Structure formats: structure tokens, C-alpha cells
Amino acid sequence: MRLPPSSDTTAVSFVEVSSLHTPHSTLHEETIVVLTGDILLDRGVRKVIDQHGVGHLFSDGVDSVFKSAQVVVGNLECPATKIKSPVFKRFIFRGEPEWLDTLRQHGITHLNLANNHSIDQGREGLIDTRSNILAAGMVPIGAGENMQEAAQPVLLAEHPRKVWLVPSLRLALENYAYLTEKPCVSQEPMDSLLSHVYRLRQQDSTAVIIVSLHWGQEHKLEPVPRQRHDAHMLILAGADVLVCHHTHTLQTVENYGGHAIYYSIGNFIFDQPKPLNSEACMVRLRVSRNGLDVETIPVEIRQCVPYIK
């Protein structure tokens, strides 16, 4: 596993994209999974789309990274629905469902909904977003008709080894009731999340288990002690890597027992112009039969568009 050179906690250490080599492998010798930060399709990003089209949001460098992967997971930070039933909260977002087709055309295969904005247009808007993602040829993650469905781990790949993603929102939702039998996003207690990871590991010792958490304090550069504790517990339960988001900043990467913990990879397609919010990264996992290579790809966001640094 390629990690920042430390046995404990480090600042983010990037791998130069130009040095990354994709082997000319035969089918199933290697699976490449790329994970990105927050994707917003409203507010300032909506203005860019109205002026230039959705395709403008994907730079050549990002397209190249996506093209090299079999699986690309983005965190969709808004509902994509025609339903307008806003929840009473400070920031309310909504993207157009027809824009999802372009996300798929540029290589995104899975969209995570286990975040604090997927419910911005209510439960009906959440389920409609889920249906719209499926209709666009992508897989929705972390949302369902009830908590049991929403919290199910998602199988990203089967060869050369199974790759699972376990999503979870670790924040309280603003003015939104926690009802486990109603449409919702994955928001189980930590004990349940640990049990999911532990069961996956017990079922298959060779599987790659990715945990994706939406958590942390916005605009901060370091996680709080409770996050570190929970992250360590997830690794001990069997997770191989944690790739998290929500803070709109690039936070510390920790090497815990040889496992990478990305406490926040920052934004991806977003409209926050401050330098603090414009530095981000993607995470690329190369899964082979005999190993897992974790690579950090630096990103700079300019006028809502992510560029490879």
C-alpha cells in the first residue's frame, strides 16, 4: 500500500499523477477505483452549467483519471430531482436530473447519497434522486426506502477481489426526523457500522473494504479526537481504507497500522472560491490479486471545475 511516509499521522502527501502507471493488464488482473469529494449541481455551479454546459465541469486531467478506472465514486451533495419540496434548513440545494447523464458520460459510475444535502427536497426528492441516478446508468449508494436498505454495503467490483464500499452519514440532519422505516440516507449508529465492516471481513478475508463517511467540522483542517477514535475502530473491525468528506477542506491523512485514513478529501465540483476550499484530492485504489495500492491525486478547483495539480 502506497502511503505518506510515516508510521502515524502526516500531512497530506501527494503522488504526482504523471508518475502513476497503469499496467497493460488482462481482464480482471487489476481493478481501479477512484473516489472524489463533494459534487454540487446548484448555486454557483448551476450558473456555470447554464453558461457552459455540464461537460465544462470535467477538465481533461480529470477525464483522463476517470478513463483509467473501472469504478468512479462521487459524493453527490444535492438531490437531482424536479421535485421542489425543500426542507427547512439553512442551505438547500437541487440539481436537474438530466445533468446526471453527463456525469455518467464522463466516467462516474456510483454516486454517494449518504450526506446532509441528499434530503434537501424531502424524502420524496431523495427517492426520486435515487431513481434518476439509476436511470442515468449509475449506482446510488447510501440511500433507500428505509435505513436497512440505505445502510447496505455496496459491491463495487468482484474481480480480481471483491471491493465493498460502506457509506455512512455521521452528522445530525437539520430539521429532519430520524425515522428508520421511512426513506432515508445511511445514518446508523457506529456500533451498527462497525458490525457491517466486521461481518464483511469475516465473510471474506481477501475482500477490499472501503468506508466512506460524511463527517467532521466544516472548514477545519484537522479531525476531532472522536473521529480519530471511530476511524481506528473501523480499521480494527476490518476496513482497508477510509475515504471521507463533508468539511469542504483537505484534511490530514493518517497511516494507521498500514491503512490509510483520509479524514476529508475536500470538494470536487463546488463553488467555494477560498483557497482553503479549493485544495482537494481524489483517491485512486489499484486492486490486484495480491495487493492494494492507495494513491493520492491532488486537485485544485477553479471556478467550480476540478483540475489535476
How would you name each of these model-derived features?
Residues 2-309:
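Acidic, metal/ion-coordinating pockets
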